């Protein structure tokens, strides 16, 4: 097997694995949002605190997805 083709194949495989971070972040954000909506429906007076915590948690979750996307792009374009 050509070494250059092997490296390209492994880079594509690594990019696919790194892109899985986006799936995990999406699932996590969806679960957190669902639980926040349940919490607000149970206790409407705490909606401000629940929503601020949700926004901070979602930011951290989406940061993981962005890091995975950046790594995948680096592997695809071999920067």
UniProtKB/Swiss-Prot annotation:
Regions crossing the membrane: 7-27, 56-76
GO cellular component, one term: plasma membrane
One annotated GO biological process: proton motive force-driven ATP synthesis
Alphabetical keyword list: ATP synthesis, Cell membrane, CF(0), Hydrogen ion transport, Ion transport, Lipid-binding, Membrane, Transmembrane, Transmembrane helix, Transport
Topological category with respect to the lipid bilayer: Multi-pass membrane protein
Family named by the database record: Belongs to the ATPase C chain family.
UniProt subunit comment: F-type ATPases have 2 components, F(1) - the catalytic core - and F(0) - the membrane proton channel. F(1) has five subunits: alpha(3), beta(3), gamma(1), delta(1), epsilon(1). F(0) has three main subunits: a(1), b(2) and c(10-14). The alpha and beta chains form an alternating ring which encloses part of the gamma chain. F(1) is attached to F(0) by a central stalk formed by the gamma and epsilon chains, while a peripheral stalk is formed by the delta and b chains.
Name the UniProt record assigns to this protein: ATP synthase subunit c
């Amino acid at each position: 097997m050509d070494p250059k083709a092997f490296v390209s194949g492994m880079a594509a495989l690594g990019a696919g694995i790194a892109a899985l971070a986006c799936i995990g972040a999406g699932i996590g954000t969806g679960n957190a949002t669902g639980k926040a909506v349940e919490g607000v429906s149970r206790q409407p007076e705490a909606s401000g605190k629940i929503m601020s915590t949700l926004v901070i948690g979602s930011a951290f979750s989406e940061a993981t997805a962005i890091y995975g996307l950046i790594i995948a792009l680096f592997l695809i374009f071999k920067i």
